[in-house]
From Swiss-Prot:
Keyword Electron transport: yes
Domain Cytochrome b5 heme-binding: 83-148
Residues reported in the UniProt entry to bind heme: H100, H123
Organism: Chlamydomonas reinhardtii (Chlamydomonas smithii)
Group of enzyme by EC: oxidoreductase
Role noted for this protein: Fatty acid desaturase that introduces a cis double bond at the 4-position in 16-carbon polyunsaturated fatty acids that contain a Delta(7) double bond, resulting in the production of 16 carbon fatty acid (7Z,10Z,13Z)-hexadeca-7,10,13-trienoate.
GO cellular component: chloroplast; chloroplast membrane
Coiled-coil regions listed in the entry: none
Protein's GO biological process: long-chain fatty acid biosynthetic process; unsaturated fatty acid biosynthetic process
Protein name: Acyl-lipid (7-3)-desaturase, chloroplastic
Topology in membrane: Multi-pass membrane protein
Residue range covered by the transit peptide: 1-47
Reactions that this protein is recorded to catalyse: a (7Z,10Z,13Z,16Z,19Z)-docosapentaenoyl-containing glycerolipid + 2 Fe(II)-[cytochrome b5] + O2 + 2 H(+) = a (4Z,7Z,10Z,13Z,16Z,19Z)-docosahexaenoyl-containing glycerolipid + 2 Fe(III)-[cytochrome b5] + 2 H2O; a (7Z,10Z,13Z,16Z)-docosatetraenoyl-containing glycerolipid + 2 Fe(II)-[cytochrome b5] + O2 + 2 H(+) = a (4Z,7Z,10Z,13Z,16Z)-docosapentaenoyl-containing glycerolipid + 2 Fe(III)-[cytochrome b5] + 2 H2O
């Protein structure tokens, strides 16, 4: 796939198989905003005339004007930089890549895109982090208008109020020393200990039961330590976070692809029908949203989805290899992924295949191995599918009728209140026990507001979030138990499967897909 196709809006949308006729026509030949188009035309005649000026704001070096414009993803004068955009200003991240406290892998997510939302949602003290930007080189005359703009969490009054209270009441200043990224060490030992014990049992006697027990371990890894590690929230040490994140690869996923489709797409644009890959990645088999086209069989999806969920892990396998070859996962292009990160995917897949298939087949024969592997795959897939899906697919988070959530999602992605969006499009269930076993994913609202905080702090944070929402009359969705929200999820899937398709009011915003 060539570079143009990788970044085309058609590829971005049809990868989820959800393009409508109107949208497909608007995306077939994506057009930049007016300023971007003028810049691109001017670049044709000046590309070889001058190089862009890099300004070090720390010393306030004078900027020499150069002809602006060009394609920042293809023109050589821009591609030689590890550029990102923050609040309308383009920076070169190159001198900071190996000095970022959170590690290079997280910073790589910002390369080649407007990273405002990533930046502001990941730092509990944004004023401190923003001061670091002032030390980075600014790319003068960079075609910022050509880069799809990002939401701006710091413009959310709700988010700012919650974050300030979390700093004062939960961490009381200790976040300066990284307290918000610690506290889950005990959970990590429990998860890894269980997984290791079940693998020993699996290799001792590979069969569907031991495979299923190991599958629970694989699911527990996926819900907890890999999730928290890839968010940079398991430790203040990026090496520890990376190692925890790589357990995703051992369990059958890909930490690299997860970081891009989960953090760049889902977390920033939760329940956006165009930009959140979780909304459309299962289509056309499953219709998670009434803004997607309706097929006759969707009315039965609440029944047949249980026959599809066991194969989730196999879908991951196919998708990860495809993404490696195309440089794009569902919802995001891998602009900043390093060669080493790509190599971890290959090494991780080979290790997973050896541990799940190769060694048991050698010890017990192919028949025993196949039975055990089936137990693993089906159990892990069902647990992950059920626990992931309930968080954003209930009437409160995707209402079929008008209300505050629908109104929020009908706004432009860059103008809607980001903090309010995270609250309205997520639902919680359970409490401390659920938090331990799901890595905080049961407290999905708090996780979406603070993805870089260790999940062990979410129960305390949830009290603050609920209180701030109550003061403002913002709905805060919480179910008492997993069976309760799971039952409501099943009913919602029946309702949305039968609901007529609703028109989308933001067709013009599909242009954003051309560069995501």
């Amino acid at each position: 796939m060539n570079a143009t196709m990788q970044r085309s809006a058609v590829a971005g949308r049809t990868s989820g198989k959800v393009a409508t006729t109107a949208r497909a026509s608007s995306m077939a030949r994506p057009r930049l905003p007016i300023a971007g188009r003028v810049a691109r035309r001017s670049a044709v005649t000046v590309r070889a005339v001058a190089e862009p000026v890099v300004v070090d704001k720390a010393v306030e070096a004078p900027a020499k004007p150069v002809p602006s414009g060009g394609d920042p993803w293809e023109d050589e004068k821009w591609t030689k930089y590890k550029w990102t955009v923050y609040r309308g200003v383009a920076y070169d991240l190159t001198p900071y890549l190996d000095r970022h406290p959170g590690g290079r892998w997280l910073l790589n997510l910002a390369i080649g895109r407007d990273a405002t939302a990533l930046f502001e949602s990941y730092h509990l003290r944004p004023e401190v982090a923003a001061s670091m930007l002032k030390r980075l080189p600014v790319l003068a005359d960079f075609p910022v208008d050509a880069v799809p703009p990002s939401p701006r969490p710091n413009d959310s009054e709700l988010y700012n109020a919650i974050r300030e209270r979390v700093r004062k009441e939960v961490f009381k200043g200790t976040e300066i020393k990284g307290a918000h990224r610690s506290g889950s060490e005990g959970a990590a030992f429990a998860v890894l200990g269980y997984a290791a014990a079940m693998y020993a049992l699996y290799t001792y006697d590979a069969n569907p039961l031991t495979g299923a027990l190991l599958g629970l371990g694989g699911a527990w890894i996926g819900l907890t330590i890999q999730h928290c590690g890839n968010h940079g929230a398991m430790s203040t040490n990026p090496v520890v976070n990376n190692l925890m994140g790589l357990t995703n690869d051992l369990a059958g996923g890909s930490s690299l692809m997860w970081r891009y489709h989960h953090q760049v797409s889902h977390h920033i644009h939760c329940n956006d029908d165009a930009l959140d890959e979780d909304v459309f990645s299962a289509f056309p088999m499953l219709r998670f949203d009434d803004r997607l086209p309706k097929a006759w069989y969707h009315q039965f999806q609440h029944v047949y989805m249980w026959a599809l969920f066991p194969f989730l892990q196999l879908v991951f396998q196919i998708g990860d290899w495809q993404a490696l070859l195309t440089n794009r996962t569902v919802g995001a292009t891998l602009y900043g992924a390093s060669n080493f990160e790509r190599q971890t995917l290959i090494a991780g897949k080979l290790a997973h295949y050896f541990l799940l298939y190769g060694l048991p087949a050698f010890l017990h024969g192919p028949t025993a191995m196949l039975g055990g592997a089936a137990g693993y795959l089906f159990t892990q897939s069902i647990v992950l599918a059920a626990t992931f899906a309930v968080s954003h697919n209930v009437p409160e988070t995707k209402p079929l009728d008008p209300g505050p959530t629908r109104e929020n999602l009908d706004e432009s992605a860059v103008t809607r209140d980001w903090g309010v969006q995270q609250v309205l499009t997520s639902a919680n269930w359970g409490g401390v026990i659920g938090n331990f076993f799901t890595g905080g994913l049961n407290l999905q609202i708090e996780h979406h507001l603070f993805p870089a905080i260790s999940f062990m702090h979410y129960p305390a944070i949830s009290k603050i979030v609920a209180d701030e929402c109550k003061q403002r009359g913002i709905p805060y969705s919480h179910y008492d138990t997993l069976p309760e929200i799971l039952g409501r999820f099943v009913r919602y899937m029946k309702e949305v499967g039968a609901a007529p398709q609703k028109p989308v009011k933001r067709d013009g915003e599909m242009l954003m897909l051309s560069k995501f």
